[in-house]
Swiss-Prot record:
Subcellular location, record wording: Cell inner membrane
Keyword annotations: Cell cycle, Cell division, Cell inner membrane, Cell membrane, Coiled coil, Membrane, Transmembrane, Transmembrane helix
Gene that specifies this protein: ftsB
HAMAP family assigned: FtsB
Family, per entry: Belongs to the FtsB family.
Protein name as annotated: Cell division protein FtsB
Biological processes per GO annotation: FtsZ-dependent cytokinesis
Length: 94
């Protein structure tokens, strides 16, 4: 009976060790949980960026205001009859 109790305590000790420090134990679980949370934050940022891009694509397909805005800011285009004024700061290095 005494040998059985010692064997049972050893088995329980081994099970506790593997639970806390072994492969797929609590330490690994905490690390994986942290990795999952970080990845979810990255994914949410990417979802937000995708939503903005889809909204911009939809705006470019349906309206001419977005196309005009891009032409003005990215390509420096102006409409007929408009005058373009460029104001340069005296402190600028250009």
């Amino acid at each position: 009976m005494r040998a059985f109790a010692v064997l049972l305590i050893i088995a329980l000790g081994w099970l506790q060790y593997t639970l806390w420090f072994g492969k797929n134990g609590m330490e690994d679980y905490a690390q994986v949980s942290n990795d999952v949370q970080l990845q979810e934050e990255v994914n949410q940022g990417l979802r937000n960026r995708n939503g903005q891009m889809f909204a911009e694509i939809d705006d470019l397909r349906k309206g001419s205001a977005a196309i005009e805005e891009r032409a003005r800011h990215e390509l420096g285009m102006i409409k007929k009859g408009e005058t373009f004024y460029r104001i340069i700061d005296e402190n600028s290095e250009e």
